[in-house]
Structure formats: C-alpha cells, structure tokens
C-alpha cells in the first residue's frame, strides 16, 4: 500500500505560545489503514488532526517547520476547498459542526460544495443514511437530536463527501457508552466495507483498540510510540507512564503477565481476555482424580 | 409540529402547501397595501383578513399575545404624538380641551389613519414569521436566485440567534447558581447585571466562530477561489415545486396590488373623504 | 522552513495601538470563511440582543429608550471592520421585524444603522485608537463617535423615515429624536466600554480580528 500521509520532521508552534504544540513529528500512514492516536490532554493530537486537514496553517497563526504531505503533495499546495475533498474531519463537539436547518441539509451541504449533481447527491444521501441509521431523523433540526445521533450525523456528513482520509477527533468524548458503541459500530462497518484511511483520536480505548491496525502515542508534542496495535500495547509501562489507561481487561491480563501467569499475546478485547483467562485457569487447575464410571 | 420562526404550526397546516416564494411575495407586496389606503376601515379589514389567514393556517394564535403590549403602546404613542404633542393649530377644529391642552379633530383623525395603517403592516410580518420555517426562508431566497453566500449567512445567523438564546439561558442559570438573580430587582440593577451576561455571551460566540469556520472548511466550503465558484445543486429546492396554484396565488397578490393602485389613483377609493369610519368618528366626537 | 509567523513583537499585552491596526510587511491576512462566519454570528447576536431592547423598552416604530443592540453594532464594527458594519446594518432589520416594526420602515432605517456602525469603526482605524481603551484619548474617540453616529441616526430615522411615512407629526419628532439618540447613547455607555475593555485583548489575537476593513 502506498503511503497516503507523510509527515516529515513537522513542528508547529502557535503564535503567542512558548512551546511548540508538535515537535519533530515523522510519520507515515498507509492508505486503507485504521490508525488510533492517543495521548494525554495537550499532547498535540488535535493539532495533528488540524495539520492533516489543512486547517493548520490556513486558519491558525503560528510557525511551521517541516512538511505534511497528503498523496505526495504539501497541504499548503492544495487550493482552498481541494484538500477537504481528500481529507474529512469530524470534530469532538457535534453541536459546533452544524450550520444547517435539518439533518438532511447537513448531510447534503458537503456534497453541494463538491459540485455533485442532484442524482449523485440523492444516491450518496441514501447510502450514508442507511450506514449511520439516520433515516428517521432527516427532517429534524440537527440541534434537537441526542448527542449520539448528532455525532452520527456529523460522521455521515463527512462520509458523504467520500474522502480518502477520515479523521475523527475524539468523536465520542461527549457521548454515553451506548451512543459511543453506536458510533463505533459505524466505524466497524466503514472499515469492513470501504477502503478509507481512518484516523481516530480517542481517550477511551475500549472500542478503539480492537479496531485499529496501528496505534500512535503522542506526548508533549512528540511522537513517543508508533506500532502495530498488539505490539503497541505490549509497551504497557510506557503507556501507563504517559497517563494512558488501556482497557481494563487488557490491564488485568498484563498484571497476570507481570506475575508470570501468562506469557502470550496481549488481548485487545474482553472476549480475547476471557480466552486468555480460561487458558491461565486451565493451566493452574490441579489435575483431578481420574474419573471412573461403572 | 413544525417549528417556524415565531413558534410552531401543526404539520397538517394548509400553509405548507404554499411555496415559500409565495409567502415571501405576500410579505413584500401586502406590506405595501396600507401605504396606499387612507380609510381606516379598509386597513382594519386587511388586518382581520391577515389574522384570518393565520387562523386558517392553524397558527397558534397565542403567539399574538407577545404583540398585544407592543400594539397598545404603539397606539398610545401615536395618539399622544398626534394629540397632546400635536402642537397648536388654530386652523383645526377643536374636539376637546384636556388639562389646558387642545385636542384637535384633524389630529385624532390623522392618528386613527396612521394607527390603522401600522396594524396590518405589523400583522403581515407576524403572519410571515409565524408560518415560515427557517428552511422556507432559505428556499424563498434561493428561488429568486439570491447568491448562496447571502442565503447561507442568513441561515447561519438564524442558527446563531438560537445558540445565543441557549447560551443566555446557560449563563443566566450559572449566575443564578451563584446566587445572582435579576428577578424582582430594579431596572438600573438589571441593566448593570445584564452587562455581566453580555461579556460571556460575546466570548462564547467568538469561540464558536472558530469552530463554525473549521466545520465549514472541513465540509469543503470556500468563500474565495475556485471552490467558491462551484455550481451548487441546491438540493433543498427539490423538495419544493412551484405549482399552478402557487402561480395563481402570486398572480392574485400582484393583481390585487395593481387593482388597489388603480382604484386609489384612478377612482379615488380608500381616501379619507369616502371613509365611513372617519365620518362616524367625527359624528361621535361632535 | 518557518512560515506564517506574524511579526508582531512581544505579547499582545505589550502591543501599541499603532501595532494593533498596522499590517506588518509580509503579514498575510486573507479574507476567508471565518469572516463570513463572524458576519453571521454578529447578525445572530445582534438579532437577539436588539430584539430584547426593542421589546423591553419601546417608544414605537423600532425606536427604543434603551437599545442594547448598539453594543453589537458598534463594538462588532470596531473589531471586525466591514463585516461588523454590514452586520450592524442588517441585524436591526430582523430584530425590529420580530418586535413588530413594519417591513418597509425597518428597511428605511438601514442608512441610520449603517452610519452608527461605520463611524466608530472608521474612527478607531483612522485615529489609531486602542480598542482595549488604554488611554483617555481612546475613551474620548469612542464617546465622540457614539454621540455623532447616534445623532445622525436620530435625525435620519424620526425625521426622514417616520415623518416621511407620515407616522409622526412635526411636533412629536423631537421626542423620537431624543428617544433614538438617548436610547443608543445610554445603552452604548453601559455596554460598549465594558465590552471593549473586557474582550478586546482576546479578540485582537484571533484570526477573525480585522485590521483594515476586510481582513
């Protein structure tokens, strides 16, 4: 797979800030990958997301060094509106993303900006409505629906533009667990059915860990760790040092590993963890008396 | 229920069968009618007609309660302006003398004419606001090919107004949670304290501007450059069709206006001399 | 390679008024989506705040004893240049409409509102007054422009508009002139100074702040 994103020695310092928000970032993301980005607050995750979408430096004042390339071209080299055809961003606050009167208008807005025709819009509208389960909400004002529904609308609105890269900046931070799961269900479908490159910035790793192909750890503007997901979570001590809270099931098995009860691959999901525990218990269980019948 | 600019209208209302352009045309043209009608009875009849349209459209007539104090105060201001503050005019007929102030018949007549003119203008606007959803206004504007950026600014402004109102409630509740409430306090106190609301409201809106701009850019919207010249599909217009009935209504409104002008300037209708209301008022005051 | 570094020396607290309004050599200030958004937001805020004033303290025909919308009109124009002037011209039309002022009367008020928004914005830029109101001169410029612009509005609207529409007698025009003038100046005294003092320091750092007229 050819790289779709290439970041070379990239640093960004906002005007009036003493320290750079991102410092010396080098990163390559292959097309079609599902990448998770984690890090404590203030680590530069959102700055990175904005840098990939061209919002930095076009909308923010600061000092940039290095290069951010999308499909081999620097983000600043794209004319206004062109990069957004390739890179879509879903922000953490769905309320702040809505400028239309109805959910349908919200979904259609991006497609109209692309210059699509009415039949094309209709077709894509049907597709994203089905994907994100929004059929019953189309006539409603977007600010009158629930938080989870809002975030699905925001996701669908960006998806309707069929960007090659989708970036979701803490899409579930304001949602309850049920709504969070529904958003991730959409992401699961996207991963299975589409070939978008998906980058998710999240604090909550319960759902992200099982979906991501690769994980990135940012801290204080620096890229501390980048690896395939299983290998990423093997570096548990580094993650814990940097304030990352892996899923509880994963932490539990890690403790068993530290105690010497388990030495295989770290599980990413509760089901995998249950399988690990079953294996551990089976090994520890003393052999019982041979059963006899008759 | 469908939310209009001034409240809610049931989904079954006949007003939704009317194309938004017709509603806008009605507002623009019918607002002019009173300017050419001097006879108060005709203007009052127009006002009743508009109220009747509101009732037919199944608008919740309680929305009119907001305007009752304003209508009364405006009427008081007009009558005071014309009578008590009307000056000394020996050439006018004296209708009464109250506390040393001359009240002239011509001033009472003129005040009645002006007040009767204002009322249908106000209710034409109220009718429009109470039967038009935000989307309708956008569609009406797009139907007459007003540039997209203008209609979009208008839509965002409406959205912003809603958010400011929500923010106001939040800020007010936050202040109340700190034991700070304006209820039952004097006007100067309230004015001083509203300043404390304005600052966070402005600050919230400024922060929101950055988020809105990012959201627009993320959806590929551009104000300048090639992306701004993209031909837009105007998908929202596909939900509305300008039918023969709409054409008839538009024509009827236009013809009514033309007929009004012909009757007014060609045949002297709607003038004061022909007004039975003015004749009755004069008799009553004599 | 360093890019997009505004060469504004020092922290915003140390900037002079001259520096606030001056565009540095090489400084790029493109007109963008943010300005459209600011325009829309100012119209929205003004619509709510103006309608509050129109409904709460009415004299009649959109003239008010205490018009809170003046703050959005004038402070918005100082901060955001032509976008603020445009918003300040447009939003009273809507706030008056909701308050019951007839369509064509609201339309006829447009020149008055345009001048009320334009004059403070022009004066601050022309005289390089500090929007943070750091000196007596800044206060004086603001006060003077508030008075002059409201005086124009007060003459235009009752005299030209309301008298022209036949809604007022000649003798009652002074009441409405003073009502318009007083309603704007008093509300401006209450809100403009405090808003500028409290928020200008933040606003001038944002990309939406307009140094010239459009960006």
Could you tell me what each predicted segment is?
Chain C
Residues 2-60, 75-167, 192-205, 209:
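Short helix-perturbing small/polar motifs within transmembrane alpha-helices
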Residues 67-75, 103, 174-183:
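Short aromatic-rich membrane-water interface segments that cap or initiate transmembrane helices
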């Amino acid at each position: 797979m050819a790289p779709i994103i290439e970041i070379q020695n990239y640093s960004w310092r906002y005007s009036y800030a003493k320290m750079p928000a991102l410092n010396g970032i080098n990163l390559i993301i292959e097309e079609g990958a599902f990448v998770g980005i984690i890090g404590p607050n203030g680590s530069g995750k959102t700055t990175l997301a904005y840098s990939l979408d061209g919002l930095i430096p076009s909308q923010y004042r600061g000092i940039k060094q290095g290069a951010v390339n999308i499909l081999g071209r620097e983000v600043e080299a794209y004319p206004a509106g062109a990069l957004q055809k390739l890179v879509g961003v879903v922000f953490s606050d769905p309320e702040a993303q809505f400028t239309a009167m109805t959910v349908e208008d919200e979904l259609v807005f991006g497609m109209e900006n692309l210059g699509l025709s009415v039949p094309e819009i209709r077709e894509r509208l049907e597709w994203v409505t089905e994907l994100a389960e929004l059929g019953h909400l189309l006539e409603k004002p977007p600010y009158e629906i629930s938080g989870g529904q809002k975030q699905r609308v925001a996701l669908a609105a960006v998806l309707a533009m069929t960007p090659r890269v989708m970036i979701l900046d803490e899409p579930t931070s304001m949602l309850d667990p049920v709504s969070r799961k529904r958003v991730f269900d959409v992401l699961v479908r996207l991963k299975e059915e589409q070939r978008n490159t998906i980058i998710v910035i999240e604090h909550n790793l319960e759902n992200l860990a099982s979906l991501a192909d690769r994980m990135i750890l940012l801290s204080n503007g620096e890229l501390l760790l980048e690896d395939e997901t299983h290998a990423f979570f093997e570096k548990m001590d580094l993650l814990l040092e940097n304030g990352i809270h892996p899923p509880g099931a994963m932490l539990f098995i890690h403790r068993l590993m530290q105690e010497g009860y388990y030495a295989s691959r770290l599980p990413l999901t509760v089901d995998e963890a249950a399988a690990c525990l079953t294996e551990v218990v089976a090994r520890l269980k003393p052999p019982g008396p041979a059963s006899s019948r008759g | 229920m469908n939310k209009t600019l001034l409240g809610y209208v049931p989904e079954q209302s006949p007003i939704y069968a009317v194309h938004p352009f017709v509603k806008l045309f009605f507002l623009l043209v019918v607002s002019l009618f009173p300017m050419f009608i001097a006879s108060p009875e005709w203007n009052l009849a127009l006002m009743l007609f508009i109220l009747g349209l509101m009732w037919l459209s199944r608008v919740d007539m309680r929305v009119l309660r907001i305007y009752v104090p304003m209508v009364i105060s405006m009427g008081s201001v007009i009558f005071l302006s014309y009578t008590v503050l009307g000056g000394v005019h020996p050439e006018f007929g004296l209708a009464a003398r109250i506390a040393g102030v001359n009240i002239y018949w011509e001033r009472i007549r003129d005040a009645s004419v002006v007040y009767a003119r204002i009322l249908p203008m106000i209710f034409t606007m109220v009718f429009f606001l109470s039967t038009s959803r935000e989307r309708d206004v956008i569609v009406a504007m797009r139907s007459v090919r007003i540039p997209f950026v203008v209609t979009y600014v208008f839509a965002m402004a409406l959205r912003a107004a809603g958010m400011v109102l929500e923010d106001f409630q939040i800020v007010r509740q936050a202040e109340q949670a700190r034991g700070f409430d304006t209820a039952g306090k004097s006007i100067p106190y309230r004015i001083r304290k509203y300043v404390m609301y304005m600052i966070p409201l402005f600050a919230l809106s400024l922060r929101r501007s950055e988020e809105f701009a990012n959201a627009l850019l993320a959806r590929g919207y551009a104000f300048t450059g090639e992306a701004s010249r993209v031909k837009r599909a105007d998908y929202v217009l596909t939900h509305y069709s300008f039918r023969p009935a709409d054409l008839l209504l538009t024509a009827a409104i236009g013809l009514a206006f033309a007929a009004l002008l012909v009757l007014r300037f060609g045949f002297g209708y709607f003038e004061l001399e022909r007004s039975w209301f003015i004749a009755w008022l004069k008799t009553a005051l004599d | 390679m360093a890019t997009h570094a505004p060469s504004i020396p020092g922290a915003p607290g140390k900037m002079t008024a001259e520096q606030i309004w001056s565009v540095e050599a090489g400084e790029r200030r493109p007109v963008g989506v943010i300005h459209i958004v600011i325009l829309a937001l100012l119209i929205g805020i003004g619509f709510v705040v103006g309608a509050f004033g129109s409904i709460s303290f009415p004299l009649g025909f959109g003239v008010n004893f205490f018009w809170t919308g003046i703050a959005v009109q004038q402070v918005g124009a100082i901060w955001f240049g032509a976008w603020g002037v445009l918003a300040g011209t447009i939003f009273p039309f809507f706030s008056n409409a909701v308050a019951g002022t007839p369509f064509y009367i609201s339309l006829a008020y447009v020149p008055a509102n345009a001048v009320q928004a334009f004059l403070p914005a022009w004066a601050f830029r022309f005289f390089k007054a500090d929007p943070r109101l750091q000196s007596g001169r800044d206060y004086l410029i603001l006060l003077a422009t508030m008075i002059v612009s409201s005086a124009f509005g007060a003459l235009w609207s009752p005299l030209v508009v309301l008298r022209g529409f036949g809604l007022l007698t000649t003798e009652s025009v002074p009441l409405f002139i003073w009502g318009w003038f007083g309603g704007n100046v008093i509300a401006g005294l209450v809100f403009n100074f405090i808003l500028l003092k409290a928020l200008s320091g933040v606003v001038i750092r944002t990309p939406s702040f307009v140094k010239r007229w459009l960006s």
